[in-house]
Amino acid sequence: MSKKPVVLMILDGFGLTNKVDGNAVSAANKPNLDNILKKYPHTQLGASGMDVGLPEGQMGNSEVGHLNIGAGRIVYQALTKITKSISDGDFFENVALNKAIENVKKNNSTLHLLGLLSPGGVHSHIDHLKGLIKLAKEKDIKKVYIHAFLDGRDVAPSSAKEYIEDIENYMNEIGVGEIATISGRYYAMDRDKRWERVQLCYNAIVLGKGEEANSAVEGLEKSYRDNKTDEFVLPSVVLKEGKPKAKIENKDSVVFFNFRPDRARELTRAINDKVFDGFERETLDLTYVTVTEYDSTLENVEVAFPPEHLNNTLGEYVSKNGKKQLRIAETEKYAHVTFFFNGGVEEPNEGEDRVLIPSPKVATYDMQPEMNAYEVTDKLLERLDEDKYDMVILNFANPDMVGHTGVFEAAKKAIETVDECVGKIVNKVLEKDGTAFITADHGNSEEMIDYSTGKPMTAHTTNPVPFMYVSKNSKELREGGKLADIAPTMLQLMNLPKPSEMTGNSLIK
């Protein structure tokens, strides 16, 4: 007998806005989604700010979106938690951070602060770096060096100068800290095992080798002259009297202040793992602190803000009730439909199968806007024909990953690809008498122009996202929902009572 699967399709970075300029979502030819909107109930969901546990006005992102969807409750994010701890003063008493401080005092060594220098709030926040500099000042640490990773992706592509000057002014004011290296996030924050990129960043911060400049701004301006925006700035060493200002050396302390794990793991492993095979390098004896847990298998790492365990996430609860589930995505979003969707738990639930389709190896995804969506779709259709699964969670990476390139025509093509795939999947789900829910984790490709400057916008947005309910007997949906309401809606369709931990509410009227 055919199971009636409940399928959740997350179209990553597919937001909604009435504005037409720079809107790849509205410009794309998408007959399947247009038809679904005509025929089936749909609503809009909040996917940013307080709706997902972020500060008001803060754009959503994939990690946060999948956490909230999978948890069925608002999950207060590391950004909100750390900012609050700085304003409450608890931050300055943090045990892990103070271990880094004590090590520097004991060995008369150096404190290195690594992370994305940006107010973007997706991977890091510049205010958290200021908190760390203030902590160093309060504890009377003299040798404090910043290894600044430049953004240009969650903020405007060429905005780094503003943030470099902001942090330099803060350090001058407070009387401690200097920038030792700068590096585009393309090198410092890879997540696809492109070790040749990570190695260039490692060489700058550990060996003092790379592009050279007499100041961070000089290094940045040199990069701009070579037509490289912030994200792609080659790892550069800031010199003092012809020598690198600082390198990470034995007995030093390192604090990596990115709070989002996925793009901080590789560099952490390169610097701190005792056994490492990404490239040849010496092992260092460091006190290494990460503000959040990047990976539970990392050794010799202190975690300043350890994860809080989320009980009864959608996947866990469905599993406890004896149901079978499938998670499927390509590499770029695989962690999102597994680790993040499961509340930061790496282990699959019982009865949870996973399918990973490798993302194409291209320099930037505007070169292949369809990415591997067709392969994901074909594999899913095969799996649906096995009639094994009660629930399927699927992510299409295209609207987000191609939206990040800022190339409008490519983003349009990305949406058109996804539309084609959605059409095939919806037909199969209806054939099985199942239900398809179509949503997104945050916006991106619906707003590819910065309306204030007219320049390309590569960041996420604060726009709402769609929620479409496709089945042979769809019911009306209520307004005013948020991502946390999706899991309770799916449980209702699966005839499972909502667990007490889920504070979201079903979207079905």
From Swiss-Prot:
Pathway: Carbohydrate degradation; glycolysis; pyruvate from D-glyceraldehyde 3-phosphate: step 3/5. The active site is at residue 62. This is 2,3-bisphosphoglycerate-independent phosphoglycerate mutase. Belongs to the BPG-independent phosphoglycerate mutase family. It comes from Clostridium botulinum (strain ATCC 19397 / Type A). The keyword Metal-binding applies. GO terms for cellular component: cytosol. InterPro entries: Alkaline_phosphatase_core_sf (IPR017850), BPG-indep_PGM_N (IPR011258), Metalloenzyme (IPR006124), PGAM_B_sf (IPR036646), Pgm_bpd_ind (IPR005995). Catalyzes the interconversion of 2-phosphoglycerate and 3-phosphoglycerate. It is an enzyme of class 5 (isomerase). Binds 2 manganese ions per subunit. Mn(2+) 2 binds at residues 12, 62, 441-442. It catalyses: (2R)-2-phosphoglycerate = (2R)-3-phosphoglycerate. Mn(2+) 1 binds at residues 400, 404, 460. Pfam families: iPGM_N, Metalloenzyme. Substrate binds at residues 123, 153-154, 185, 191, 260-263, 333. Gene3D superfamilies: Alkaline Phosphatase, subunit A (3.40.720.10), BPG-independent phosphoglycerate mutase, domain B (3.40.1450.10). GO terms for molecular function: manganese ion binding; phosphoglycerate mutase activity. The keyword GTP-binding does not apply. GO terms for biological process: glucose catabolic process; glycolytic process.
